[in-house]
């Protein structure tokens, strides 16, 4: 790879020693493995910056379809080794370190695992990002920049104890803060609607705003000069403070990007989880539409050029948020906005037990997200009307397929309703969804209703091959 500081062993050694001494104002012989890791990571990020920028420019130039992959987790692991290998510079660094008497493995182990994931959901998301970058596909991730990640476990006096995962206590050499792309996200308040010149005017009044600040991390493709982006959103004070206690406002907003999966057994915990989900979904969708409009000057072709991939139900609020932007801000008619929305969204389901499918109490949902609730309610009303028209004497079918029922908002039903592509994460998983847990939804819909929910059984496919799924999403034309 043509990276100036890594072109050969001699050049890299000189640049590396100089950078260590200049950054820390010490003799190189006195540098620690951690200091060497920081300099190595920063040098690599600096050298792949041109590829990163060129990847963005080439996507714009080609007017290519772009996937925005939303997940509450990205279990990335240590990135330094993978990045060195994908950039094609690992052999140069290894030989240079051997000649300098540095143990590369020890330097690699100075990196703290990014506290962005906990299990299979996050590992799948991380594999997606690595694979699609290596395939040269324009796919960019969205997540929260959790300060403390999940938690670390230990044993004390024979008992398990948990500690915060302070993965950001040291420098994150990969991230770049992008203040200019910050977004302010509203919570609470109430909605005032009126008509002006035949157009619906919606105003969110008395809202409590939180600023979402993006931090970008490069995802380097395997020896192909492609660098995609994982964007992490951090919660900070908005430009206008709410008319409440400032200390309480700061405490609550800091919690949004504090940790992965806060305890939701309490009312406050439920509010925080729903806040987290809307926070990064709204910021990511707004940002994606801004980028799209800079290139195409319109949102009417959004479904031809953008896909929002919903990784499990946590980002399912993409559906009403996209509708909100298209109807309230872009002033599209509902039917046109809904057509665009359901041709933009793809959904991966990770849960096979019906009782574990994510649901939100209606009162909490409507209080925290008043406009999103109104839109979700309208999606549900229209869908139920169509089911009712087909099965006028069978209310059980209507109830079993409803997005909102019995005081709950069913997020999996919402994601399926708007998804042009729905899949499980394994063949068995998908079969269980089709024939057991979501059987009522799938088997009771005719071809007309399948346009709204899924193309009958064919809309479900297993996640057998990351490449095939992403190619299908990128090549999809409604």
Give the location of each predicted region:
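A conserved ligand/cofactor-binding region detector
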Residues: 1-478
């Amino acid at each position: 790879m043509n990276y100036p500081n890594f072109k050969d062993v001699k050049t890299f050694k000189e640049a590396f020693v100089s950078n260590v001494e200049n950054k820390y104002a010490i003799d190189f012989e006195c540098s620690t493995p951690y200091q060497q890791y920081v300099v190595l990571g920063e040098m690599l990020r600096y050298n792949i910056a041109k590829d990163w920028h060129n990847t963005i420019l080439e996507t714009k130039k080609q007017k290519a379809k772009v996937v925005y992959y939303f997940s509450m987790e990205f279990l990335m692991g240590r990135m330094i080794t993978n990045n060195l290998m994908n950039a094609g510079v690992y052999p140069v660094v290894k030989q240079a370190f051997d000649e300098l008497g540095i143990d590369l493995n020890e330097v690699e182990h100075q990196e703290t695992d990014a506290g962005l994931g906990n299990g299979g959901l996050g590992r799948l998301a991380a594999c997606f990002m690595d694979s699609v970058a290596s395939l040269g596909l324009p796919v960019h991730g969205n997540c929260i920049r959790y300060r403390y990640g999940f938690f670390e476990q230990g044993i004390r006096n024979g008992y398990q104890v948990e500690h915060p995962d302070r993965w950001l206590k040291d420098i994150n050499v990969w991230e770049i803060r992008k203040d200019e792309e910050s977004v302010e996200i509203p919570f609470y308040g109430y909605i005032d609607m009126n008509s002006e010149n035949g157009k619906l005017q919606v105003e969110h009044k008395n809202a409590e705003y939180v600023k979402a600040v993006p931090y970008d991390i490069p995802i380097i493709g395997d020896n192909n000069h492609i660098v995609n982006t994982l964007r992490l959103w951090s919660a900070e004070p908005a430009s206008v403070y709410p008319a409440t206690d400032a200390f309480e406002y700061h405490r609550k907003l800091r919690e949004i990007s504090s940790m992965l999966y806060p305890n939701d057994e309490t009312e406050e915990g439920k509010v925080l989880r729903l806040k987290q989900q809307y926070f990064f979904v709204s910021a990511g969708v707004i940002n994606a539409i801004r980028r799209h409009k800079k290139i195409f000057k319109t949102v009417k072709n959004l479904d031809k050029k953008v896909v929002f991939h919903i990784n499990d139900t946590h980002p399912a609020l993409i559906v009403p948020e996209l509708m909100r932007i298209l109807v309230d801000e872009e002033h599209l008619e509902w039917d046109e906005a809904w057509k665009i929305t359901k041709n933009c969204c793809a959904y991966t389901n990770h849960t096979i037990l019906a009782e574990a499918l994510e649901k939100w109490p209606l009162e909490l949902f409507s209080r925290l997200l008043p406009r999103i609730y109104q839109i979700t309610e309208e999606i549900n009303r229209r869908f139920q009307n169509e089911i009712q028209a087909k099965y006028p004497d069978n209310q059980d079918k209507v109830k079993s397929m409803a997005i909102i029922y019995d005081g709950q908002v069913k997020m999996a039903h919402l994601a399926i309703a708007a998804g042009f592509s729905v899949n499980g994460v394994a063949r068995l998983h998908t079969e269980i969804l089709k024939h057991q847990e979501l059987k009522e939804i799938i088997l009771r819909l005719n071809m007309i209703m399948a346009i709204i929910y899924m193309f009958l059984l064919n809309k479900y496919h297993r996640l057998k091959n990351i490449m095939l799924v992403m190619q299908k999403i990128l090549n999809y034309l409604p």
